[in-house]
Swiss-Prot record:
Residues 175-263 form the GAT domain. This is TOM1-like protein 8. Might contribute to the loading of the ESCRT machinery. One of its GO terms (biological process) is protein transport to vacuole involved in ubiquitin-dependent protein catabolic process via the multivesicular body sorting pathway. It comes from the Eukaryota. Residues 448-460 have a biased composition (Low complexity).
Amino acid sequence: MVHPLVDRATSDMLIGPDWAMNLEICDMLNHEPGQTREVVSGIKKRLTSRTSKVQLLALTLLETIITNCGELIHMQVAEKDILHKMVKMAKRKPNIQVKEKILILIDTWQESFSGPQGRHPQYYAAYQELLRAGIVFPQRPQITPSSGQNGPSTRYPQNSRNARQEAIDTSTESEFPTLSLTEIQNARGIMDVLAEMMNAIDGNNKEGLKQEVVVDLVSQCRTYKQRVVHLVNSTSDESMLCQGLALNDDLQRLLAKHEAIASGNSMIKKEEKSKKEVPKDTTQIIDVGSSETKNGSVVAYTTNGPKIDLLSGDDFETPNADNSLALVPLGPPQPSSPVAKPDNSIVLIDMLSDNNCESSTPTSNPHANHQKVQQNYSNGFGPGHQEQSYYGQGSSAPVWNLQITQQPSSPAYGNQPFSPNFSPPASPHYGGQNNNVLALPPPPWEAQSPSSSPQYSPTHPMQVTQVVITTHTHQPLGYNPQGGSPHATNNNNNNMFGMFLPPMTGGHMPPPFGHNGHVTNNNYNPNMYGGYGGQAQPPQQYLVEQQMYGMSLQDNGNNNTNPYQVSSHQPPPMMKPMNKKPEDKLFGDLVELSKFKKPTSGRAGSM
């Protein structure tokens, strides 16, 4: 008699396996091992049924109890000739589903129970009998193992998975053989040919892709791509892996381009052309802070080529070195020291401004490799002589920058020769006499400290003009208030020397004297006669040095009180050379004084 639970689990009324009933039977066998024989006998009887449906349900129940139950079930199945019954059913060509189910179960069991050397060799014997009959076993299905199953149930799923993986690997290797270096090179050659043909095909012409050669090349590239993927996943050689990855990227790019053209999307081809035709950026960036000034011109560094004016053919972006006024540097201010080469450098100042009378003390550049010269001028004759003072003729007009030194007229008189550095004497008188100064005193707002001696470091003077003015008084040198030209003085040798000072109009500087000329002053003080009567005072010379440095004209005289100076950016005066005549220094002090008029104090301060 069949066990009632087995009867219900294998009823022909069921549409499919009743998994709840099957698991209930497994639990019963695990808790009541005495019912194992009765359950196995009932399954054997249900296999002899003529209904294929019942046979399938009986085989499913048998598979479930062997998988989830213990060793007792395995032994009962092997001893009750259930395996022999199943072999007979497979040989009689039953229903295809029943036969396939029997073959799968016998193959799985013989592998799980370790073949002929296992604990139950009956399973392996059944497997060998079917093989001798020429029956081909199907692919093994995957069975999920149970957590409570012992030995055979644990090894069964693992072995089935390994067998399936081996079968998949074998089929893959047969379908995609491993690539070699030669095949990789062949693949690249095919890619090059296909790329050239695709470049020759118009993006809008889809018919060109339907050519037999193109279709064949695309098919080969796709096959190589699959083989490359298999190579990357299976190889352990690093060099082959790198070559495979590079080939895979190239194949992917080429096939994507083919698909884009086939779908009508020719943007890829247009983008490649646009990349080749994009011109360089013509935007120029000029770094004003890092520009260099060379010879008065600004050099701006740009990264692009020059632009040419099509009409004139001139380069209008590159600065011209000859035109230094085109660009003005915006960096730090240029030093006030004179430049070495006045290449078209023009400095404009307001000649009528009152600020021109402000005293300026030029500073030397400590980093320049020039000699630092400091000139302190004095008469050098002891306390009986007074240091000369120089004042301009008014603050509204520009003053000619001069350097006045004091030296004796001739070494033949026994006076001390001229020296560039003398300490100024403290006495303000000539021989103890009080001399009246006709020049205007300095205004209080332009007072300068006596200690601030103007120093100057000459760099590269362009021209040096020296004018020696011989006088007999301490009267400061000034312009002739009467008009354009001063009076010339005739010495004993009848040599005429003079200076031409035209009236200053429009804020322009009058031209200075000739080079190395000696001019005698035409303004004398009546007090000088006492000097000739009381004591013989040697005539005095004032050396006027004018140094022209291209952009500036600086006063380096010894007047520390209040020299009226123009700015360092005053345009240089034009020099007008005169005919040089020899001077008789022996009788230079004998001058006819009746021909000259002394200037009044009221007119001394006006132009």
